[in-house]
Amino acid sequence: MKKLTTLNYGFPVLFAVLIGSCNTEPVLTENNANARGKEYYLQLGQKLENPYAVKNMRKALDSVKSKMKFSKSAKNTSEFDIETSHLYVKIEPKNADEEAVLKRDTSQVFFDYPLDYEFPEEVLQQMGTNDAESISTYYVAVPKEYVFPAGIKTEVLEELYIPEQDPYFDDVTETGQVNKSTIGTKEDLLGSLLIEAFKLTNNEKELGLESWTAGKSSWWMFGSKWRPSGKITMFDNSLNKVVPVEGAQILIRQWFTVDSGITDVNGNFSTGTVRGQARYIIQWERQHYDIRNGWFGQAETRGPSKKKESWNYTITDVDDIQYAMIHRAAHHYYYKDIKELRRPPFDSEMPSRMKIAAIHDLPNGLNGDTSFWRGLAGVLPTIRIYKRNNCHEYYGTTIHELAHASHWKMGWWTFQSVEDKVKESWARGVQWELTRMVYPIYTNEYFGDYTGVVQDMIDKDYSIGDNVTGYNIRQIENALMYQKTWNDWKNKIKQDYENTTENNLDQLFS
């Protein structure tokens, strides 16, 4: 929360701007010949042969028809053919406006890494570009009829056929068994097609197949549809207990099939149904905010690949704790009770969603900062939250920075000329008020421009001689609107609200 010095983060020269809050000195991004391009990580992964490619599905169907018999009861299935159902698309927004328009469609899940690659876990943790002039490249599988927003550059990487999403198989009666030699039902056809496609592309192990024989007949224990579910918690070292992570977006991914669920107040979630093995992923974003892994990569916590198993997970990794704590505070400010305060900017009110960078470095006198000009450029995050030792520190810092964002939203055309003492004292007050809703004994440190004036107007503690009480946080926020100076804010409070202790405001604001 102190002043920043000029920093070199290895980015090309983009701009030098004044940080909107928590800092008064320019942050200059400097040229670095080692900047990574958007596709830098492709060379660190292994491209997989795609079983869902139309060309491979057609080969699989031809193989099934040549090797297996079709029973009389399944005569119609022998006429089944493969047609493109989905498109695997690479998307390259050229600016933040295009990125925001793209991501406004919450029916699609966009990944900043390709879906037909296998990456080591350590590479996935560092995914993204560090080139400040680049918007991330995104990958998605969409129905073939899907229309992308006009003007955004897209490239179809592969035509897909995803049988699990084909209405032809909606009426399958599931037994979990697939006959090895005869197509007698739609379930036999679906299972045989998938098994053959995965075999032809050397992905058979992903199906986790088991064989079963009875007399002259043999079956694959293919498995029926199942609904992924689980519970996400974390150890909160400030509360000294395991707590649920509410409001987190959980993805279940099986190649190009992606479904999602949101954790409830107890951390429980469930998603749509899948068949076979699928990977659980926590993608740390919601409609209005997007937590970044450092400056640019999407923050994710990658869970295991499971088949008919729930994922009950307690977060312990230090980076994942950082993501989870930023999320908990952001989710509170955007979606939960905030005592009638105004929310931070929604996705429709900025060029892109509120980007919050989880900076994994230990702070050098800085807990976090907010730059609206940096965020308005769209490429860089509006907010940065640095590594902390305790969970309540993450929470309070995130609330503080989002309070600046909400203040900016109240009157962005005047915000830059508001006195630092007003900005920081207000954000410090919101930090105290909202953080105590989760950490009841939370206390703030006050110094310089970071005064305790908001707390003093609310609490009944007269021990430090403030002698003001009885105001609420919404009243103080209402009086803050459009006020630029310390005295203007004080006078607006006096003007708008009657209070038996208001005669002591002059002393408090002195």
PLM features per residue range, with description:
Residues 322-388:
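Auxiliary, metal-adjacent structural segments of Zn-dependent hydrolase domains
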Residues 417-456:
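Post-HExxH zinc-binding segment in Zn-dependent metallohydrolases
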Residues 254-268:
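Short, acidic Ser/Thr/Gly-rich low-complexity loop/linker segments typical of extracellular
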Residues 382-398, 417:
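Short pre-active-site segment immediately N-terminal to the catalytic Zn-binding motif
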Residues 54, 61, 71, 227-228, ...:
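Short, ordered, surface-exposed loop/turn motifs in non-cytosolic proteins
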